[in-house]
Swiss-Prot record:
This is Ubiquitin-conjugating enzyme E2 R1. The gene is Cdc34. CDC34-catalyzed polyubiquitin chain assembly activity is stimulated by the conjugation of NEDD8 to the CUL1 SCF E3 ligase complex subunit. E2 ubiquitin-conjugating enzyme that accepts ubiquitin from an E1 ubiquitin-activating protein, and catalyzes its covalent attachment to other proteins by an E3 ubiquitin-protein ligase complex. In vitro catalyzes 'Lys-48'-linked polyubiquitination. Cooperates with the E2 UBCH5C and the SCF(FBXW11) E3 ligase complex for the polyubiquitination of NFKBIA leading to its subsequent proteasomal degradation. Performs ubiquitin chain elongation building ubiquitin chains from the UBE2D3-primed NFKBIA-linked ubiquitin. The lineage of its organism: Eukaryota, Metazoa, Chordata, Craniata, Vertebrata. It is found in: Cytoplasm; Nucleus.
Length: 235
């Protein structure tokens, strides 16, 4: 019996998932929320060493549309985040996740928005860049933006913003312990890229559902650019 047609988005997502598990982006771990659903991913983000996010374990979800990669996925933090470019809902305000339409009112260039040549790897790199370098122009969280600017302008003397971040980082340790996750705390640990273990029999069957034999082959914020801001620790 002929196999049913598989949407091209499933094939694209499977290739990306395997690639990210075999060669992870530093500071990230991606898995499926449900093994039978390629359109919903769980993302674990580890806070980069030598920043105020160091030691943090932040959980997020990536939800892909059926026409991916022609439309962007949605990225939402499950962990409570205090950041100028993250809404209270956890949704990230970043240009790369916006559909490729020409909207002069947005303050974004079309080239800053999503296009089909981009992928999950570029999204993850954009997210970690945004965490460390917030864009405070028309922010998603105004209060966080005001606090961040005070911290920046005081050269780190006003610590209200960073104190909130450190408190949130400490709070993520409970999630890490519950999930059995060892959070990297040194640059050496953070930069180690480990390949995913070989798939078991069940996983082979899962992959076979999407591919015929031999078929598998080898950040701007949402409101436009501004001067670089840094989330790294200052003396």
């Amino acid at each position: 019996m002929a196999r049913p047609l598989v949407p091209s988005s499933q094939k694209a997502l499977l290739l990306e998932l395997k690639g990210l598990q075999e060669e992870p982006v530093e500071g990230f771990r991606v898995t499926l929320v449900d093994e039978g659903d390629l359109y919903n991913w769980e993302v674990a983000i580890f806070g980069p060493p030598n920043t105020y996010y160091e030691g943090g374990y932040f959980k997020a979800r990536l939800k892909f549309p059926i026409d991916y990669p022609y439309s962007p996925p949605a990225f939402r933090f499950l962990t409570k985040m205090w950041h100028p470019n993250i809404y209270e809902t956890g949704d990230v305000c970043i240009s790369i996740l916006h559909p490729p339409v020409d909207d002069p009112q947005s303050g974004e260039l079309p080239s800053e928005r999503w296009n089909p040549t981009q992928n999950v790897r570029t999204i993850l790199l954009s997210v970690i860049s945004l965490l460390n370098e917030p864009n405070t122009f028309s922010p998603a969280n105004v209060d966080a933006s005001v606090m961040y600017r005070k911290w920046k302008e005081s050269k780190g003397k006003d610590r209200e913003y960073t104190d909130i971040i450190r408190k949130q980082v400490l709070g993520t340790k409970v999630d890490a312990e519950r999930d059995g996750v060892k959070v990297p705390t040194t640059l050496a640990e953070y930069c180690v890229k480990t390949k995913a273990p070989a798939p078991d029999e069940g996983s082979d069957l899962f992959y076979d559902d999407y591919y015929e034999d031999g078929e598998v082959e080898e950040a701007d914020s949402c409101f436009g650019d501004e001067e670089d801001d840094s989330g790294t620790e200052e003396s």
